[in-house]
Curated annotation (Swiss-Prot):
InterPro entries: 4Fe4S_Fe-S-bd, 4Fe4S_Fe_S_CS, FTHF_cligase-like_sf, Helical_ferredxn, LUD_dom, LutB, LutB/LldF, LutB_C. PANTHER family: LACTATE UTILIZATION PROTEIN B (PTHR47153:SF2). It comes from Oceanobacillus iheyensis (strain DSM 14371 / CIP 107618 / JCM 11309 / KCTC 3954 / HTE831). Belongs to the LutB/YkgF family. It comes from the Bacteria. [4Fe-4S] cluster 2 binds at C322, C365, C368. Is involved in L-lactate degradation and allows cells to grow with lactate as the sole carbon source. Has probably a role as an electron transporter during oxidation of L-lactate. This is Lactate utilization protein B. One of its GO terms (biological process) is lactate metabolic process. Keywords: 4Fe-4S, Electron transport, Iron, Iron-sulfur, Metal-binding, Repeat, Transport. [4Fe-4S] cluster 1 binds at C312, C315, C318, C372. Residues 303-333, 352-381 form the 4Fe-4S ferredoxin-type domain. GO terms for molecular function: 4 iron, 4 sulfur cluster binding; metal ion binding.
Length: 478
């Protein structure tokens, strides 16, 4: 399994994003709104940097002792009658879940929003085995109907407008009302209600698993998690192995950071906590509970210079300030995980072969690092990825290597440099208009296809300096 969402080339995805005016406007508007909310909530707290430091320390401590806390978590879950399965790979996770679904003879599975289940391709695996899978998060449900991957970690359907959503509902579910948000939401609620009531198995992700109690917490705004965790007889939680905290107090800190950093709220509408199978004295919840803990490449990141990437609490604060994401959108990253955190995490989970461009999808402005509520040094990790790509993986294009080698030889030869600056203006004259090079030749074409390149000056700095020095000397002698 792969975190990739398609086979279209990186350049084609970027071009498609840049040409999508609605998407760019929607992303820009959302980024501004989320950023304003985050800054407002940080100011209201008054000691935001102290909270960030505490969040970073909690994540660092947890990962440095992850074996202990995973063991504690599994003990607590099993103590309450749950089943725990450690999946080394996506295939192992999917196979285990498929077997549970088949054993229950389940025809319908209902899910909450979950990045890790998208990462391992769980929906596709279950559908191949004959089960109907229904996403219950509104954004994810829209995308599922339209067979479209998410473009944002928190707001997966950010790239769609309400007219497109209405068309999807009409084509796939016979919707015949207007595109007003209220009517669209009411229709989705009516449709999903039937799925909740008829589902045989409920599958959730996990925001934070609490090691000391075995509790699983879900942070949502729609209330769908309550339905998924209380109605089906069989419940399966799928979590990345890093998604745990030692105590309830640690969870409180990270949830406070998560909600403020993600959407600028003190709290989301719902924070759900559940602890496995239903006990005799309880009136709702599943009879059978399974916790699937997924590695899928994460253990290889532990103990490396990229370990802090696993601190991520999936708030998307880095995405909400990224200028590259603003212009190209989430699909350009060709990964379930877009934005700066995706550019760091995707090559670690899936290798450089298909994702060697991602570390370069950054201006290195460090806005992502500044926004991250758990202080992941994202821009530094992007630079390190670039070093590895060039020095170890040897993934740089041959043309780029030849070009850079030629540039080095040219720039280190004063005579060649001086001559080229003299002839450059004349050589580029056929492509120059109003002091800018348009539709330039050779290596300049990639640049000038999307923006104008300043034409060489009428006089080089070197010549100007020489004339200035001569003038001062003459004035001094007069």
């Amino acid at each position: 399994m792969s975190v990739k969402i398609g086979e279209i080339s990186y350049k084609e995805r970027i071009d498609k994003g840049i040409d999508n005016d609605f998407m760019r406007q929607a992303v820009s508007s959302a980024q501004g709104r989320f950023r304003k909310g985050r800054l407002s909530q940080a100011e209201e707290l008054g000691n935001w940097e102290d909270w960030r430091q505490l969040g970073s320390e909690i994540r660092t401590h947890t990962l440095e002792n992850i074996d202990y806390y995973l063991h504690q978590l599994s003990e607590q879950v099993e103590k309450r009658g749950g089943n725990v399965f450690f999946a080394q790979t996506a295939e192992e996770a999917n196979e285990y879940i498929e077997n549970v679904v088949k054993k229950k003879q389940a025809k319908k599975v209902v899910k909450t929003k979950s990045m890790v289940t998208e990462e391992i391709g769980l929906n596709e695996a279950l559908e191949k085995s004959g089960a109907e899978v229904v996403e219950s998060d509104l954004g994810e449900w829209i995308l599922q109907l339209d067979e479209d991957p998410p473009s944002h970690i928190v707001t997966p359907a950010l790239h769609k407008n309400r007219q497109q959503i209405r068309e999807t509902f009409a084509d796939k579910r016979g919707y015949d009302k207007t595109d007003s948000p209220e009517e669209l939401a009411a229709f989705a609620r009516e449709q999903l209600r039937q799925d909740f009531l008829t589902a045989d198995v409920g599958i959730t992700g996990c925001n934070f698993a609490i090691a000391e109690s075995g509790a699983i917490t879900l942070v949502t705004n729609e209330g769908n998690a309550e339905m998924v965790t209380s109605l089906p007889d069989t419940q399966i939680t799928v979590m990345g192995m890093e998604r745990l905290v030692p105590t309830w107090e640690d969870m409180e800190v990270l949830v406070s950071l998560l909600t403020r950093a993600a959407v600028g709220q003190k709290l989301t509408s719902y924070i759900t906590a559940y602890t496995g199978a239903r006990l005799e004295e309880e009136i709702d919840g599943p009879d059978d509970y399974h916790l699937v803990i997924v590695d899928n490449g994460r253990s290889k990141i532990l103990g490396t210079e990229f370990q802090s990437a696993l601190h991520c609490i999936r708030c998307a604060a880095c995405i909400n300030v990224c200028p590259v994401y603003r212009h190209v959108g989430g699909h350009a990253y060709n990964s379930i995980y877009p934005g700066p955190i995706g550019a760091v995490l995707t090559p670690l989970l899936d290798g450089y072969d298909d994702h060697k461009e991602l570390p370069y999808a950054s201006s290195l402005c460090a806005a992502c690092t500044e926004a991250c509520p758990v202080k992941i040094p994202l821009h530094e990790q992007l630079i390190r990825h670039r070093e590895i790509i060039v020095e170890k993986e040897k993934k740089s294009p041959v043309s780029e290597k030849i070009m850079m080698k030629g540039f080095a030889q040219w720039a280190s030869n004063p005579a060649a440099y001086k001559l080229s600056t003299k002839v450059a203006r004349t050589a580029l004259k056929p492509w120059t208009k109003d002091e800018f090079v348009e539709n330039g030749p050779g290596p300049l074409k990639g640049w000038t296809d999307v923006r104008d390149f300043p034409a060489p000056g009428k006089q080089s700095f070197r010549a100007w300096w020489s004339e200035r020095a001569k003038g001062e000397k003459q004035n001094g002698n007069s």
